[in-house]
Swiss-Prot record:
Originating organism: Streptococcus pyogenes serotype M49 (strain NZ131)
Domain of life, per lineage: Bacteria
Claim: Electron transport is one of the keywords in the record: no
Gene Ontology CC: one annotated term: ribosome
Function description: One of the primary rRNA binding proteins, this protein initially binds near the 5'-end of the 23S rRNA. It is important during the early stages of 50S assembly. It makes multiple contacts with different domains of the 23S rRNA in the assembled 50S subunit and ribosome. Forms part of the polypeptide exit tunnel.
UniProt KW keywords: Ribonucleoprotein, Ribosomal protein, RNA-binding, rRNA-binding
Family membership: Belongs to the universal ribosomal protein uL4 family.
Subunit structure: Part of the 50S ribosomal subunit.
Region annotation (Disordered) ranges: 49-78
Residue spans crossing the bilayer: none
Alphabetical GO biological process terms: translation
Protein name as catalogued: Large ribosomal subunit protein uL4
Keyword rRNA-binding annotated: yes
Entry GO MF terms: rRNA binding; structural constituent of ribosome
Amino acid sequence: MANVKLFDQTGKEVSSVELNDAVFGIEPNESVVFDVVISQRASLRQGTHAVKNRSAVSGGGRKPWRQKGTGRARQGSIRSPQWRGGGVVFGPTPRSYGYKLPQKVRRLALKSVYSAKVAEDKFVAVEGLSFAAPKTAEFAKVLSALSIDTKVLVLVEEGNEFAALSARNLPNVTVATAATASVLDIVNADKLLVTKEAISTIEEVLA
């Protein structure tokens, strides 16, 4: 099993944490990670695009001229698609772009990205992130003490609201709980900062 150093909030190494190889030590499956990232990005699309077809455009209820005898081409409505101001044919309508992948695929993708971060030495374990009150400056001190100055995803245990509130104004810092972190979140981060409790939760869910 892989061991990673465990730090406290001041950046001091206090011990080490043994990681479960079934979660943090597998061979990353890049193709599965790719599929899950595409799926999650598709789910983020707004999908509110819409145009009016000939039935939705205002006007055009009366035939513009009689069918025969004028010498002009027959027309039934001034809102037909060939008219200026007419309806759009086969235009986009509101829809959801999201689609779900099997749970086994999603779990394998999570294990793959966690394992990749550990292998690349981009996984920082911290004993805990406890704050007496939401303070952005205090959270910034923690990151500075741990020498984290890149885009970071902070994974905390459920109910640690002060950590999330303390980090929300910091650029390049995202906070999520261990149970809700997505593959897209992890891939987008340069480093992971994970509390000891969050590591236990991840192993419980994925092992």
